[in-house]
Amino acid sequence: RGLPLLKPPYSTITAIDITVEGRQIKALAQITKQGFVYTFDRETGEPVWVIEEREVPQLPLIPGERLSPTQPFPTKPPAFERQGLSTEDLVDFTPAIHAEAVEILDNYTYGPLFTPPSVSVPGGNRGTILRPSAGGGANWMGAAVDPESAVIYIPSSDSISVPVVVETDPEESSLRYRRISYGGTRGPRGLPLLKPPYSTITAID
């Protein structure tokens, strides 16, 4: 199945008239939390540019979960937001601050886009960091289009979220696991865990 809370936001389908290789296309642009724009011909429903099904991480896996082995990646335009997480993405105002951020990150599971949620264990793994967060990337605020230039403007945020999934007490529930929160995590000394910028407006021609 798809990963939780990464479904497209409801209000981010934008009508746009574009010219591709000399051909005028009445298109729809679907802006997503993942930082992708999926572009379709609004008369035929066909993708304007190829959408590739690419293999995505399958581990860690919460017992009982069955994930799709692939996810759709548009070949154009490039992602408008940074995706996935590594130590190079952490706040680095000073070497000491960066080292502290790495120590914080070591408590979590992280990796490329679509890394699955993991079970949080007391004294161990605290969950999987999603980037962009469950709130995006882009979200309900959508995008704006200049009808004369066909440039689309997308506001987005570079943020993280952590779906905290824990094993339940069998005396309290028949469900083996439950999600108790969907918050984020702070970086060292009250700073964000990521390096800036934290918000952008991307113009795509």
Predicted regions and their residues:
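Beta-sheet-rich non-transmembrane sensory/scaffold domains
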Residues: 1-205
